[in-house]
UniProtKB/Swiss-Prot annotation:
GO function term, MF aspect, one: magnesium ion binding
Source organism (scientific name): Cereibacter sphaeroides (strain ATCC 17023 / DSM 158 / JCM 6121 / CCUG 31486 / LMG 2827 / NBRC 12203 / NCIMB 8253 / ATH 2.4.1.)
Cofactor: Mg(2+)
Protein name: Hydroxyethylthiazole kinase
BP-aspect Gene Ontology terms: thiamine biosynthetic process; thiamine diphosphate biosynthetic process
Annotated positions binding substrate: M43, A191
NADP found in the keyword field: no
Enzyme class: transferase
Function description: Catalyzes the phosphorylation of the hydroxyl group of 4-methyl-5-beta-hydroxyethylthiazole (THZ).
């Protein structure tokens, strides 16, 4: 693939409109992360308009963090709208294995053909129908334990699958890439995983999904590394992280991205 900086440069030049159906905890954080990176967020979730809006946006992201029947209607309408308009959409199957309600929702959204699926190891294992030790939205499984399931899920769904953790794994069922960028402070700030899904959507709006997803993970992780250089804890890290997303240059991303073929 081209240098990751090329993907960042394209995303910033095009400033894609990304429709984000995310959870109550994450909404403000996701919007600020996308704005800092150079995209344009729209938090449009109600079924009355979500499907219509998905045809206007350049990408859609759906996060299952706090589902309710009305929000589920909006998710499904948006996914159908994105598919009909040929727009990429990203599924974040938060805690998909935790309850029967979430398992059913995950299966229905998967049937609507996401372009990219981004989750932690336990979520990807559960979505693929494999045994998992996940606890709620947190992963109790290592990324390596989900790599084979991710490949099977990519093959069966046609989606690019990203398993995120200390070292991320991305596959389209044929190819694989690992990304080692990131910092231990990142999981100490709520909604950064949800925000990563938004960034993947922004990158996938402008470039092919496999390469765009890998570049998005490297960008997000490297911004975390840069933010940690000045942060003294999770609070200052969150502010520094937004600044790093805004200031990180394509050239710096090319130098700092730690990607390798898997």
């Amino acid at each position: 693939m081209d240098g990751c900086g090329t993907y960042l440069d394209t995303m910033r030049r095009e400033a894609p409109l990304v429709q984000c159906i995310t959870n109550f905890v994450a909404m403000n954080v996701v919007a600020n992360v996308l704005l800092a990176a150079g995209a344009s967020p729209a938090m449009v979730h109600d079924a009355e308009e979500s499907g219509e809006f998905a045809a206007i946006a350049q990408a859609l992201t759906i996060n299952m963090g706090t589902p309710s029947p009305r929000w589920v209607e909006g998710m499904e309408a948006a996914a159908r709208g994105a598919a009909a308009a040929g727009r990429p959409w990203v599924l974040d199957p938060v805690a998909v294995g935790a309850t029967a309600f979430r398992r059913g929702l995950g299966a229905r959204l998967l049937a609507l053909k996401p372009t990219v699926i981004r989750g932690n190891a336990s979520e990807i294992l559960a979505l693929a129908g494999a045994e998992t030790r996940g606890k709620g939205a947190d992963s109790a499984d290592p990324v390596a334990a989900a790599e084979a399931a991710a490949q099977r899920l990519a093959e069966s769904s046609g989606a690019v699958v990203a398993v995120t953790g200390p070292v991320d794994f991305v596959t389209d069922g044929r190819r694989g890439i690992r990304c080692a960028n990131g910092h231990p402070l990142m999981p100490r700030v709520t909604a950064l995983g949800c925000s990563l899904t938004g960034i993947v959507g922004a990158f996938a709006a402008t470039r092919p999904p496999f390469e765009a997803t890998a570049a998005a993970l490297a960008f997000f992780g490297l911004a975390g590394e840069e933010a940690a250089k000045t942060a003294t804890g999770p609070g200052s890290f969150q502010v520094a992280f937004l600044d790093a997303l805004h200031t990180l240059s394509p050239e710096a991303l090319d130098r700092g991205a730690r990607l390798e073929a898997a």
